[in-house]
């Protein structure tokens, strides 16, 4: 099965390979992205037949402008455990057990100290549960203030949250990408979000093309990401795309959680080589690894081994043999150093004393072999400004020079782009991804058409009789509830996008308000099509009254119902953890809305302690709106003469007998009632149904308002539920 390649009207730039290092092996400074863009610009003017330039992975000698130091990091959480009453109180071993819960403090990090430098890769290693991911979260400011003890500084200064989001990136373990976007489109959208507004579209495109070559994704540039139903790029390529999204703005700090997880050895090596290039371009790479191979080990600059939240080794890979030799467990020749170290750590963890001896030995070893503390000579702001002025594309950063001629000052806004730019880019991305999955909208449209066809044929051309009135009420109730149930199909959409949203907003790629508004705008065209199709089939098929104006209002009510239902489901998708629970909640609540809408039981007969549910029912207002639209004409008659007996046991009486009964009733009441006398108008039906409080337009506006209300709740659910921080 061949890969899915998205059609692109724009011609891709010719193949090029920016030179990341000196090919001859001579020492040189790492290439900044300003030089990278220049290389890209030059390469587009050269012949596309030039040969690819391999990257020299040797670490060049250079000064260290950035040093991330962490001192005595300690982090504990409370864990609930079951406490057995019989074992603690009763001396009778046969006594029944009564379990209660108590909390226990578990230390995930215990006095972790170390440092990382730009131009280098720091790898955190250890067995599962050793605290690797927790340490990365601590360094990336993903643990809530007050929970983490210790200090994390960059160039000796504590990073505030805004600054850290601008100069850092965090690559999650899972590859969360839009499946129907190509590799190039995915990176281009990331560039639109993260790169400074001062960069032109062409410069951003050049940055993307340079990054595609840096990541080794040139052959997959026009291939869609893919998912279970669409074949796309490989697992290793997906991982590199995920990395590319987070380094598009050239972060100074790059954190990665298990970047080689689930990859074969070749793909893993390719990913680490990419990270090495990123480090050599002037970034600081800090990542967790489970068990690196010998080939991966050669690319790492610093190692930090953890065991149950404590440091058991910290230093360069070259120090491993000497460290374990002095500890009394020399590494055998030709054996993988990291595998030996991890095996020994696991063996010690299973012993009576645990890894305490190794932890204490590491403290002494570090004191004896302590390196001099790195001094940058620059404050944090000066270092960042210097880095930006040399070509770093820190998210949204701009450099300005004072009129006095002093050194340039870099300004880093909270967001790289204004609100309207974010809105346009988000809408374009969502529409592009949706347009390539027409089956999703096709299924919803098909369901609406089938439901409308069934309603139209079941209630075909209803007459103005008591029976027709009852059938209209049932048709309206089912039609309004259908619009809400159809919206439940959209529940998985945001649940699939939620982690992408959380990753992007964690580092201020865009505002949450931009996402909510774009999400609403993109949904409107499909809702209009669904509403028009459903309204046209049911209105003319059932034979509803009102003519063209009645149809237009009926269409607006259907559209408002779809809008309110879509907003309600969107809000739920922001708070429920998974799809099945979401479906259960949606179906249950919509059933309650229908029950209290006024169709099954009139408002006047609803118990007082449940009347509040009647007024918050989403089905109530569109249901009453269509009733008012259909029965609002006071001159329209629905029960004439002998039709008064249609809903009674007398319906089976012969017509002549009904006429005589009607004459007898006329004499008794002292009024003339004939077979043509109107006994029930549309207004009478509205009175019987208890629909007298609001006009039809007010019912429409209330339905629309419910939609906006749930969109606002959706915004706050994103605001409160996407902090991405441990407690």
UniProtKB/Swiss-Prot annotation:
Lineage: superkingdom: Eukaryota
GO CC annotation, single: membrane
UniProt family annotation: Belongs to the ABC transporter superfamily. ABCG family. Eye pigment precursor importer (TC 3.A.1.204) subfamily.
Pfam families registered for this protein in UniProt: ABC2_membrane, ABC2_membrane_7, ABC_tran
PROSITE patterns on file: ABC_TRANSPORTER_1, ABC_TRANSPORTER_2
Gene3D superfamilies noted in UniProt: P-loop containing nucleotide triphosphate hydrolases
Record-annotated ABC transporter domain positions: 68-333
Protein known as: ABC transporter G family member 6
Residues in ABC transmembrane type-2 domain copies: 421-631
Gene Ontology biological process: organic acid transmembrane transport; response to nematode; suberin biosynthetic process
Cellular localisation: Membrane
The UniProt record lists the keyword Transmembrane: yes
Annotated residues for binding of ATP: 126-133
Keywords on record: ATP-binding, Membrane, Nucleotide-binding, Transmembrane, Transmembrane helix, Transport
UniProt GO molecular function: ABC-type transporter activity; ATP binding; ATP hydrolysis activity
Membrane protein topology class: Multi-pass membrane protein
Keyword Kinase listed: no
Primary subcellular site in the record, as a coarse category: membrane
Transmembrane segments: 440-460, 475-495, 517-537, 560-580, 581-601, 700-720
């Amino acid at each position: 099965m061949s890969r899915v390649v998205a059609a692109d009207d724009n011609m891709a730039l010719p193949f090029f390979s920016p030179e990341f290092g000196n090919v001859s092996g001579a020492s040189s400074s790492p290439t900044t992205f300003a030089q990278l863009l220049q290389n890209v610009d030059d390469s587009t003017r050269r012949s596309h037949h030039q040969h690819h330039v391999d990257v020299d992975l040797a670490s060049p000698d250079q000064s260290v402008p950035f040093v991330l130091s962490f001192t005595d990091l300690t982090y504990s959480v409370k864990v609930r455990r079951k406490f057995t009453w019989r074992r603690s109180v009763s001396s009778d071993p046969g006594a029944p057990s009564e379990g209660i819960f108590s909390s226990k403090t578990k230390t995930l990090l215990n006095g972790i100290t170390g440092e990382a430098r730009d131009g280098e890769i720091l790898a955190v290693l250890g067995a599962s549960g050793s605290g690797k991911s927790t340490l990365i979260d601590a360094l990336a400011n993903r643990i809530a203030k007050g929970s983490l003890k210790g200090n994390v500084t960059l160039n000796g200064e504590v990073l505030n949250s805004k600054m850290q989001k601008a100069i850092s990136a965090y690559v999650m373990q899972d590859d969360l990408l839009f499946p129907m976007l190509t590799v190039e489109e995915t990176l281009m959208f990331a560039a639109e979000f993260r790169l400074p507004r001062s960069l032109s579209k062409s410069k951003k495109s050049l940055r993307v093309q340079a990054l595609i070559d840096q990541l080794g994704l040139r052959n997959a540039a026009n291939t869609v990401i893919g998912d279970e139903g669409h074949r796309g790029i490989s697992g290793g390529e997906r991982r590199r795309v995920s990395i590319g999204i987070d380094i598009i703005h050239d972060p100074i700090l790059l954190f990665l959680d298990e970047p080689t997880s689930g990859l074969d050895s070749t793909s893993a090596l390719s990913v680490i080589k990419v990270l090495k290039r990123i480090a050599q371009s002037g970034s600081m790479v800090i990542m967790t690894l489970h068990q690196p191979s010998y080939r991966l080990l050669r690319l790492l600059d610093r190692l930090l081994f953890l065991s149950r939240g404590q440091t058991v080794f910290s230093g360069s890979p070259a120090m491993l043999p000497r460290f374990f030799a002095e500890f009394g467990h020399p590494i055998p020749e030709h054996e993988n150093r990291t595998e030996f170290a991890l095996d020994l750590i696991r063996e010690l963890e299973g012993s009576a004393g645990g890894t305490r001896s190794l932890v204490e030995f590491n403290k002494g070893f570090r004191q004896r072999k302590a390196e001099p503390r790195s001094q940058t000579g620059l404050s944090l702001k000066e270092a960042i400004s210097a880095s930006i002025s040399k070509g770093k594309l820190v998210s949204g950063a701009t450099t300005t020079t004072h009129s006095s001629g002093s050194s340039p000052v870099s300004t880093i806004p909270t967001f790289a782009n204004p609100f309207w730019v974010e809105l346009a880019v988000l809408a374009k991305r969502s529409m592009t991804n949706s347009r390539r999955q027409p089956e999703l909208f096709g299924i919803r449209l098909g369901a609406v058409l089938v439901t409308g066809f069934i309603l139209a044929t079941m209630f075909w051309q209803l007459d103005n009789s008591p029976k027709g009135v009852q059938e209209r009420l049932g048709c309206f109730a089912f039609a309004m509830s259908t619009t809400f149930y159809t919206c439940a199909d959209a529940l998985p959409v945001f649940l699939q996008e939620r982690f992408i949203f959380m990753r992007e907003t964690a580092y201020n790629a865009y505002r949450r308000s931009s996402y909510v508004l774009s999400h609403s705008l993109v949904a409107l065209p499909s809702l209009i099509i669904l509403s028009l199709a459903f309204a046209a089939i049911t209105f003319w098929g059932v034979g509803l009254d009102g003519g063209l104006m009645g149809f237009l209002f009926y269409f607006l009510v259907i559209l408002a119902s779809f809008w309110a239902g879509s907003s309600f489901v969107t809000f739920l998708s922001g708070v429920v953890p998974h799809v099945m629970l979401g479906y259960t909640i949606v179906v249950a609540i919509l059933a309650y809305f229908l029950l209290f809408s006024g169709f099954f039981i009139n408002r006047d007969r609803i118990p007082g302690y449940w009347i509040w549910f009647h007024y918050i029912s989403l089905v109530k207002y569109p249901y009453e709106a269509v009733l008012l639209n259909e029965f609002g004409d006071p001159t329209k008659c629905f029960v004439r003469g002998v039709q008064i007996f249609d809903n009674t046991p007398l319906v089976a009486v012969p017509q002549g007998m009904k006429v005589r009964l009607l004459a007898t009733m006329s004499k008794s009441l002292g009024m003339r009632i004939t077979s043509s006398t109107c006994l029930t108008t549309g207004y009478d039906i509205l009175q019987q149904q208890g629909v007298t409080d609001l006009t039809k337009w007010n019912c429409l506006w209330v339905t629309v308002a419910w939609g906006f209300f749930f969109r606002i709740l959706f915004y706050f659910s994103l605001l409160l539920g996407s902090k991405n921080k441990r407690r």
